[in-house]
C-alpha cells in the first residue's frame, strides 16, 4: 500500500477490503500512520473485527491514529483514510451506500480515490462493477486490482494509437464507465486538453 499512499497524497483515500483480512488492515494502518493520515473504520463487521483484533493484540494501531467517523470534519480530506466494507459490491455494505448516495456520514467527492483491495468472488463481478461505475460517475478515481481484460488493447497500445493519430478531440468508447474514465485520464496525460475529451452516454448528441 505504500506506493498508493505515496502517489495520492492530495486526495482522501477510501479502501474497501475484507473485514477478516486483519493483515491487510494492518498494512493500511501502517501506511496511514507513515503518511500522517487519520483512519476511520466504517462498516459494522469491519468495526467489530478491528476492535476484537486490537483487544487480542493481533492488530497494532498507533495512538491517536484511529478516529470516529464524526471527527472526519475536523481534518482535511487529504489527511484521511477510510477503511470500509463493500469490496464485493454488497448492496447494504458501507461502500455501496456511499456509491448510491445513501450513506449518512460519507459523501463521495470528485477528488476521492477509492481502492478495491480484493478481487471479486466469482458471482459478485456484476455487483462490484456496478459500485465501481457509480463511484466513477461521481468523479472519483477508482483503483481496482483486476484490470486485465483479455482481447482488449493494453495501456501501452492505447497510448501508441493516440500517439500515432494525435487527435484534436477524444471520445472514449466501448466499455463500462470506469473504462471510459480510465482512457480519459490516459488521454489527458498525453497532452489532449481536458475540455476536448468527452465521455458520452448512448443517445447523447455532441
Regions found by a protein language model. Give the residues of each.
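Acidic/His-rich, metal-assisted hydrolase cores and their charged scaffolds
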Residues: 1-206
Amino acid at each position: 500500500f505504500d506506493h498508493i499512499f505515496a502517489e495520492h497524497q492530495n486526495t482522501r483515500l477510501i479502501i474497501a477490503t475484507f473485514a477478516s483480512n486483519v493483515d491487510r488492515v494492518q498494512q493500511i494502518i501502517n501506511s496511514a500512520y507513515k503518511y500522517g493520515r487519520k483512519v476511520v473504520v466504517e462498516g459494522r463487521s469491519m468495526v467489530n473485527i478491528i476492535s476484537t483484533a486490537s483487544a487480542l493484540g493481533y492488530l497494532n494501531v498507533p495512538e491517536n491514529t484511529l478516529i470516529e467517523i464524526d471527527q472526519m470534519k475536523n481534518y482535511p480530506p487529504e489527511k484521511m483514510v477510510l477503511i470500509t466494507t463493500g469490496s464485493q459490491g454488497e448492496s447494504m455494505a458501507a461502500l455501496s451506500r456511499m456509491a448510491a448516495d445513501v450513506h449518512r456520514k460519507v459523501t463521495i467527492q470528485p477528488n476521492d480515490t477509492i481502492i478495491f483491495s480484493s478481487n471479486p468472488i466469482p458471482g459478485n463481478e456484476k455487483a462490484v462493477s456496478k459500485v465501481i461505475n457509480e463511484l466513477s460517475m461521481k468523479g472519483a478515481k477508482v483503483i481496482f486490482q483486476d484490470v486485465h481484460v483479455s482481447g482488449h488493447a493494453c495501456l501501452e497500445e492505447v497510448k501508441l494509437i493516440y500517439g500515432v493519430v494525435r487527435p484534436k478531440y477524444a471520445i472514449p468508447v466501448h466499455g463500462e464507465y470506469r473504462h471510459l474514465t480510465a482512457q480519459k485520464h490516459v488521454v489527458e496525460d498525453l497532452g489532449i486538453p481536458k475540455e476536448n475529451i468527452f465521455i458520452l452516454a448512448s443517445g447523447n448528441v455532441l
